[in-house]
């Protein structure tokens, strides 16, 4: 049996895991004061409340090497494993998984930097499960998912730059710091998989237009998802626009996870996509 492992920033649900014994989730950890909470047990509200009360970053930590090794050991040695990790420039999870795979001594583990997160990782998971169902080999599936990860992308509009700034993940979007008040920073992952500034505008309408223009430049698309953090109304606006553009595409609207909230803050809306071949 081929096994697929995702990290908790994917947002994969417990019900889904219960239905798929070959799919596993490994949790990142959120630090709020003296409390270390697995992301799977944390809430978005708790992260926001802590950050707003302290005006500090909410530290997160990747799964430990031991966590990965324990999960690997729970899977039969003869069963191949594909690990799908959050974008490596946002979290060290990918590098940690690579180290654990080497230490395990197993030759049948492939670790993939998905270059995405949230619904983007779920899209890759769904593709992996579909290929397993069709009877493709471990090597074929790993290669296909590696290639698909190179076609992923995202762009999001932030309600605040504070969370990126506090957490030190601002990357090439540093130029947004100190900008005029009440702007809508729009970021994306550039060709080097780094957080970069797409632009800064004053209104949500202009932020949406900027993201839509960027999305059009990525066409043709294979998959598209809408993501938000405590902004379902804003996400619904993007969803409606996306359905107008791609009426035949199955577009998913979903919330991000507590770790992504610690990185990016509340109010976010945006697109996560995979380009067609």
Please place each PLM-identified region on the residue numbering.
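Class I S-adenosyl-L-methionine
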Residues: 35-103
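Mixed-charge interfacial surface used for oligomerization/domain docking
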Residues: 3, 8-34, 73, 80, ...
């Amino acid at each position: 049996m081929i096994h697929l492992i995702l990290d908790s920033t994917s947002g994969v649900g417990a019900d889904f895991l219960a239905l798929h014994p070959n799919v596993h989730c490994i949790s990142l950890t959120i630090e709020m004061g003296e409390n270390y909470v697995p992301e799977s047990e944390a809430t978005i509200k708790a992260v926001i409340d802590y950050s707003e009360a302290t005006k500090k970053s909410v530290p997160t930590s990747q799964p430990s090497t031991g966590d990965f090794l324990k999960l690997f050991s729970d899977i039969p040695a003869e069963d191949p494993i594909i690990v799908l990790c959050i974008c490596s420039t946002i979290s060290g999870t990918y590098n940690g998984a690579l180290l654990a795979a080497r230490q395990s001594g197993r030759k049948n583990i492939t670790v993939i930097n998905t270059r995405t997160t949230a619904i983007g990782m779920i899209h890759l998971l769904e593709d992996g499960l579909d290929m397993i169902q069709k009877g493709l080999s471990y090597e074929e599936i790993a290669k296909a998912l590696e290639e698909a990860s190179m076609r992923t992308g995202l762009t999001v509009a932030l309600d605040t730059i504070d969370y990126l700034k506090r957490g030190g993940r601002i990357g090439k979007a540093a130029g947004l710091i100190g900008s005029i008040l009440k702007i809508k920073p729009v970021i994306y992952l550039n060709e080097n998989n780094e957080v970069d500034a797409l632009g800064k505008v004053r209104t949500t309408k202009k932020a949406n237009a900027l993201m839509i223009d960027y999305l059009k430049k990525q066409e043709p698309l294979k998959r598209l998802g809408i993501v938000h953090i405590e902004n379902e109304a804003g996400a619904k606006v993007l969803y409606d626009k996306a359905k107008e553009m791609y009426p035949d595409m199955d577009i998913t609207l979903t919330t991000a996870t507590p770790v992504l909230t610690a990185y990016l803050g509340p109010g976010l809306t945006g697109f996560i996509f995979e380009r067609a071949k």
